Amino acid sequence: MAGNDWINSYLEAILDVGPGLDDKKSSLLLRERGRFSPTRYFVEEVITGFDETDLHRSWIRAQATRSPQRRNTRLENMCWRIWNLARQKKQLEGEQAQWMAKRRQERERGRREAVADMSEDLSEGEKGDIVADMSSHGESTRGRLPRISSVETMEAWVSQQRGKKLYIVLISLHGLIRGENMELGRDSDTGGQVKYVVELARALGSMPGVYRVDLLTRQVSSPEVDWSYGEPTELAPISTDGLMTEMGESSGAYIIRIPFGPREKYIPKEQLWPYIPEFVDGALNHIIQMSKVLGEQIGSGYPVWPVAIHGHYADAGDSAALLSGALNVPMLFTGHSLGRDKLEQLLAQGRKSKDEINSTYKIMRRIEAEELTLDASEIVITSTRQEIDEQWRLYDGFDPILERKLRARIKRNVSCYGRFMPRMAVIPPGMEFHHIVPHEGDMDGETEGSEDGKTPDPPIWAEIMRFFSNPRKPMILALARPDPKKNLTTLVKAFGECRPLRDLANLTLIMGNRDNIDEMSSTNSALLLSILKMIDKYDLYGQVAYPKHHKQSDVPDIYRLAAKTKGVFINPAFIEPFGLTLIEAAAYGLPMVATKNGGPVDIHRVLDNGLLVDPHDQQAIADALLKLVADKQLWAKCRANGLKNIHLFSWPEHCKTYLSRIASCKPRQPRWLRSIDDDDENSETDSPSDSLRDIHDISLNLRFSLDGEKNDNKENADNTLDPEVRRSKLENAVLSLSKGALKSTSKSWSSDKADQNPGAGKFPAIRRRRHIFVIAVDCDASSGLSGSVKKIFEAVEKERAEGSIGFILATSFNISEVQSFLLSEGMNPTDFDAYICNSGGDLYYSSFHSEQNPFVVDLYYHSHIEYRWGGEGLRKTLVRWAASIIDKNGENGDHIVVEDEDNSADYCYTFKVCKPGTVPPSKELRKVMRIQALRCHAVYCQNGSRINVIPVLASRSQALRYLYLRWGMDLSKLVVFVGESGDTDYEGLIGGLRKAVIMKGLCTNASSLIHGNRNYPLSDVLPFDSPNVIQADEECSSTEIRCLLEKLAVLKG
C-alpha cells in the first residue's frame, strides 16, 4: 500500500495547487499538450510512476469516502479520470513500441535487399570510400559548418561569380509574410520561419551572380489582417550585408503573393492542403511569365528558368515538388519542423490517439508531403546535425547508412541500380549584422537617457523597466511565443524558487503581442494565465516584466538593454530545431543559457558563449543562470567568445555555401527549348510549319537524349548493345516515325486548307482551342467510360463542330488499349487532341492521318518526367515485391500480383492484381520502395485490378501542367470530368485553376477497393468548397451537363 500512500498524497496536492481537473481550461490543456502547471506535474507522476492496480485502489478508496463535501466528490472523479488516463497512455505506448519495432525490421530488410542488389560490383576500395566519406558526418564542428574565414577568401569567391545571373524561387506558404515590420508572434504560423525566408530572400538577392529571387507566398485579402498582405508584389529591401554591385530592370528580391484558397479569409496552415494545387498552378503561371521577361533582359530572348525551387515547410515542399516536376528544374527543401517528430512527441504524451492527432493537425498529410520532398529534392537543407540524425531518420525515404553507400558509389561512378537519396546539407541560418552595435556600457549611469541627452533611450526600454522595482539588476531575457513547448513556465518556476537568483537578477518575458488574453487561442491564453498565476504565487511583482506589445524593430533594442545590464539570454525550449534567437543575442554581446536538445548544441560548439541545460531540470536552469549572472569573469568570457565567432553565422557566408550547393545540382530544364529551330511556341502563324517543326523536334529530342550524359539507371535489354548500335537503332526508329508523320501532314494539308477554322494547321490541335475538356473518368467498366464520353460530346456538339472545344483523354490505359476502346465504340482518334496514357507515363497527340499513324508520341515528355526513374533496378524490385504477395487463404498460395509485361512501357511498369481486395494498399508499396531508395509513383487503377508504376513526378495532373508549359494551354480554360471516386491519383485531378465536374454514380467501387486504406481521408485534401468544383447528379443527361458548364461560365447560356 506504499504506492497508494504516494498516489493519495499526489491527489491531495492536485487539489491544493491551482484549478482541478474539472476546470474547463485546465482540462483542455491536460488533454492536449501543456507542460505548464503543477497539476500537470502531479498527474504525470501518478500516470508514469505507479501500477494500474494502485490507481484502481485509490479510486475505490475515494469512492468509499462518501461525503457531501465538494472536495471529496472532486477527488473521486479525479481518481477515475487519472486511472483512465494511465490506461490510455499504456495502450498508446504499447502501440507505438510495436510500430517502432515493425519499422526497424522493415528498414533493415529493405537495406539488406538494396545492398544485395548493389553488391555485384562492391569492391574493397569502395568500402574504403564509404568510410572516408563519412568524415563529413564526423564530430568536427568546423567541418560541419564550412564557412568563409577571411575577407580574401570571400573576395576570391565573389570574383568567380561575376557574369552569372541566376533566378531562384523560394516558397513559404503559411503565415503573414512581408518585407518589413513583420508581425512575428502574431500567431503560431507567423514565427521564426517567416523571418528566416524573408532574410534569406533579401540576402540571396544581394549576392553576386544572383539576378532575381522570388519568394512565393499566399495572398491574403482578409479584413482581419493588414492590407499589405493583399498586395500581389512587394520589392524586399536588399540586405546591406550583401556584395551585389550590379542591378537590372527586374533584379533583386521580390515577395510574390499568389491567390489561392478562400479569397477573403486568413486560415491556419492545417487548412491549406486542399488548395495546394491552386497555388501550384498560379505559381507555375508566374514563373513561366517571369522566365520570359528575364529571357528578354538577360537571356538573349531565351527563357531564363529558375536554377532551383526551394520549399520551406511541408506545405511549400509539396508545392515545390510539383513545380519542380512541372518545370523539370532542381528542387531544394528545408523542413523547419517535421511531422513525424511532432507525431512522436504527441504520442509520447499519451493524451491523444493517432486518429485524434491527425484530425487536429492533418499530420499524416503533412508527413506524406515530407516523404514526397525526399523523393523529389536534390538537396535537403538542415540547420543542425540533430535534424538529420534524430528527425529525418524517422522517414521511409531517408536512411543515413544507405545514403552514404549510394554517395560512395556515385563518387566511384558505379551504378546505383536506380536508387536515389537526397543530399543532406547542414547550413545554419544567417543573420544581418550591419545594424548591430554591441553595447559596451552598463547601467551605472541613469536609466532613462544619456547624460548629454543626445541619444534618448528607445521607448521599449521604458515599457520594460516600468515593471521592475530595481531596473539596474542584470536582466534574464526570454523571447518566444506563448507556446507550451517553449517551456517558459519551467523558467518562471526556476526563477521564482531560487532566492539568490531573484536577488541578483530580473526576468523579462517577451511573449509575442496581445490585446486581450481571452481573445487568444485556448492554448496560448492558458499558458499566459499559468505564468501570471506563478508570478502571483512566488510574489515576483517588481522582478518580472511581460510587456503586451512590441514591434519587430524593437527586438534589437531589447537585446541591447539586456546586454547593457550585463544580463543573460535563455532559450529553455524542450526541443529547439535551430535557435536563431541565440545567434541574435550573441551578436549583441549576450551570453546564453540554452536547451541541450537540438540546434543550440551546434551553435554552442561554434560560439562557446554560454551553458547548455536539460530543459526538464528546473534546478539546472536556475544554477546555470545564477552562475553566469554571479561570475562576472565567466560572463565576460562568454560575451567575448560570442562576439569573436559570430561572423560564422552571417548571411553572406550562408549564401555562399547555399549557392555552392545549388551549383552541384545537375542542371535540368525543358528539353525542347534547346532546339535552335524551335520558333515561338505560341505563334499564331496559320501554316503547316508548326506541325513540321514539332515532328522535327521529336528527332531532335532523341538526338539530345543520345548525345547527352549517360543515364546509368536504365538497365533494360537495349543497354547491353553497343552505344553506336543503340544510337543507330533509335535514330532509325524515330526517322521512320518522323517520315510517316511528315507524309501524313503533307497529305492532310490540302484538305485542311478548306477548313475555315482559324489556326487549323497547328499541331497539336490543343493550341487552337478556346477550352479543353479533359475526360478522366475512371469507370468501373469501359461501357461507363464510353457513355460518359458520348454524353459530354453531345453536351457541346455545337462548340465541338466549330473547333472551339478540344478533348483530352486521361486514363490508366496504354495506347493500344486506347485504340481498341476507340474502335469498339466507333470513335475516331482525332476526336481527342491528346491522350494521357498509363496514368501519366505517356503522352500522345492525335495525328492528321489516322489510317497510317493515328498517334504521335511526345518524346520530350519522357525526358521531362524521367527524373529519378529507377529503370530496370526498380522493375526487379517491383517483381520481387509482387512475388512476395501471396494469397494466404488460398489452397495453393497463389500469387496475387503478377507482372504484366505486355502492357508495360519504358516509363510505366504494369502489374495485374488478381484479387484487388487482398493486395496491400498503395501506401505500403510506396513505403517499400522508399525504404530501398527507389523513387516512383505507384497508381492503383481500374478498381484495384491494375498497378501502374511511373516516374515519381509523373501523373495525369502533372501531364496537364506539362501541356501548359509546352503549348501554352491555359489551365483556367480546362474542365476536368471525373467520377465520384477514381484511381489513387484521383485527388490530383480536382483543384487548381482548372474547373472540375464530378459525375456522381461513376466509379463508386474504388472508394472501398483502393481508397479505403489511405493515410488521410480525401476530405482533408479535396477543395469541395471551391467555386471551380461542381457535382453532376447520377444518370445526368447531356442537357444537364451543359447547364453545369454554363454555371462554371465555360459556356454561355
From Swiss-Prot:
Protein name in UniProt: Probable sucrose-phosphate synthase
Pathway it works in: Glycan biosynthesis; sucrose biosynthesis; sucrose from D-fructose 6-phosphate and UDP-alpha-D-glucose: step 1/2
Catalytic activity: beta-D-fructose 6-phosphate + UDP-alpha-D-glucose = sucrose 6(F)-phosphate + UDP + H(+)
Compositional bias annotation for Basic and acidic residues: 103-115
InterPro entries: Glyco_trans_1, SPP-like_dom, SPS, SPS_C, SPS_pln, Sucrose_synth_GT-B1
Regulation: Activity is regulated by phosphorylation and moderated by concentration of metabolites and light.
SUPFAM superfamilies membership: UDP-Glycosyltransferase/glycogen phosphorylase (SSF53756)
Function field: Plays a role in photosynthetic sucrose synthesis by catalyzing the rate-limiting step of sucrose biosynthesis from UDP-glucose and fructose- 6-phosphate. Involved in the regulation of carbon partitioning in the leaves of plants. May regulate the synthesis of sucrose and therefore play a major role as a limiting factor in the export of photoassimilates out of the leaf. Plays a role for sucrose availability that is essential for plant growth and fiber elongation.
GO BP annotations, alphabetical order: sucrose biosynthetic process
Subunit structure: Homodimer or homotetramer.
Similarity comment: family membership: Belongs to the glycosyltransferase 1 family.
